[in-house]
Amino acid sequence: LTLRTSIVGPELKANGEGLFHWFMHQEKQCLGYKTAIWGGVTTLELAKVVDYVIQNPITGLVQVSNGEGINKFDLLQLFKEIWHSGIEIVPVDKNGIDKSIARSQRLAYEVPSYKQMFIDLKQWMDGHISLYAANYPMEQGR
């Protein structure tokens, strides 16, 4: 089985390189590209998919996505909303690239909406603060 996707989520290393890590370390404002489209899953959602395919084996190439693209501006807005960030996200209409991923119909697992994935991720992080507190500004119930 090959799972093809793109992931976003917290990193355990201090000098993380991903979009979530980058956003969580911004101080005042950042750019949000309205024409750059992403279509993956959170790291937590990928773990759920891996657990699912272990229990429900399939073979071949499976693309893991909810089948909907989201632009980076809206993605950062979800981070801001769910993690209660005061960062100003400035919309930018350039850098048009579509990295959305079509959902494989063979995978019976239903990937939720982006908002739900990030709500779930926030709850997971809040429940496992000791894993993330060193690298991310976190408060219980925030």
Where are these regions (language model features)?
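Hydrophobic/aromatic beta-strand patches that form the interior of the parallel beta-sheet core
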Residues: 1-3, 62, 112
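NAD(P)-dependent short-chain dehydrogenase/reductase
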Residues: 1-38, 44-45
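A short acidic, often aromatic-flanked loop/helix-cap motif at beta-alpha or helix-coil junctions
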Residues: 10, 39-40, 94-99
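Short aromatic-enriched loop/helix-cap "lid" or pocket-rim segments at secondary-structure transitions
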Residues: 13-17, 75-77, 101-103
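Residue-level signal for the nucleotide or nucleotide-sugar donor/cofactor binding architecture
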Residues: 38-41, 70, 112
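Mid/C-terminal beta-alpha module of Rossmann-like enzyme folds, strongest
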Residues: 47-99, 129-141
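Amphipathic terminal alpha-helices
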Residues: 112-142
